[in-house]
A protein has these predicted regions:
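Bacterial N-terminal signal peptides that target proteins for export
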Residues: 2-16
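C-terminal motif of bacterial Sec signal peptides marking the signal peptidase cleavage site
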Residues: 23-26
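Detector for the c-type heme attachment site
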Residues: 28-30, 56-63, 78, 127
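Electrostatic cytochrome c docking/interface patches
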Residues: 28-49
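Extracytoplasmic electron-transfer domains, predominantly the class I c-type cytochrome c fold
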Residues: 46, 64-129
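Hydrophobic packing within well-folded, soluble alpha/beta domains
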Residues: 53-56, 122
Length: 129
């Protein structure tokens, strides 16, 4: 009697399973948070308060940062994308903070006048919380 072979027994099924495992592994978690060379997380924390980021975002370690307009920034190091478009690397997150409208014109996040250096400091804080 011929029994049907399980889907994963075929070479194509095994390749598909391996690809799925690889893609799921890239979705988040695991590994250390990236570092931001030359940036200061304590300065970033102060800048988050100065620019009022907590009015729209929930941010760990920042007093009264319990906004609900924008996404929570808690556990930021686990993110893989910013605004669903940009890879969440320190460089791209800093670019987003400096000029979010450039990357997503319909975003409600305002351009606040944050300099590139300040953005790197903010990113350093977000990745360390």
């Amino acid at each position: 009697m011929n029994r049907p072979r399980p889907a994963l027994a075929s070479a194509g099924g095994l390749a598909a399973a391996a690809l799925a495992a690889l893609l799921l592994g890239a979705c988040g978690g695991g590994g250390e948070a990236p570092t931001v060379p030359g940036a200061s997380a304590p300065r970033g924390r102060a800048l988050i308060t100065y620019y009022g980021c907590g009015a729209c975002h929930r941010i760990s370690g920042i007093d009264q940062a319990d906004g609900r307009v924008g996404p929570s920034l808690e556990g930021f190091a686990e993110r893989r994308y910013v605004s669903g478009r940009l890879a969440a690397t320190p460089a791209s997150v800093a670019q987003w903070i400096v000029d979010p409208q450039r990357h997503l014109p319909q975003t409600i996040m305002p351009t606040l006048g944050v300099t590139p250096g300040q953005a790197r400091d903010i990113v350093a804080y977000l990745y360390r919380q």
